[in-house]
Amino acid sequence: MSKPIDPQSAVEAMWKTAPRLAKAKAERVYMEEYRKSLKAILMKASGKSSAAAQETEAYSHPDYIKHLAGLQAAVEAEETLRWQMVATEAAIEVWRSQEASNRRIDRAAA
């Protein structure tokens, strides 16, 4: 049998996770937005005349590829924290359901 759910601990875990989740989301959004700026910077620096050639050069540039790896890490960090939050919320809902069932059993026994 699994250990009982402690709703107070779950809420405390949510309070501790929330700032980290917010920071991770901010980092992910920044990385997504900066990707556009980086592409423009690299296109301009490519020295190519056509937009297609500039874009190809920018997308294959090591700085752009490195940025994508950073974006990947930012998304992973955010999603990990988000799913921890979802799991904690689900645990609280399970506890609420168990408590409601216990109240029904108590009323039926009375």
Regions found by a protein language model. Give the residues of each.
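Short, charge-rich amphipathic alpha-helices with coiled-coil/heptad character
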Residues: M1-P19
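Short intrinsically disordered terminal tails
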Residues: M1-S2, R107-A110
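Extended alpha-helical coiled-coil "stalk/arm" regions
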Residues: R28-A58
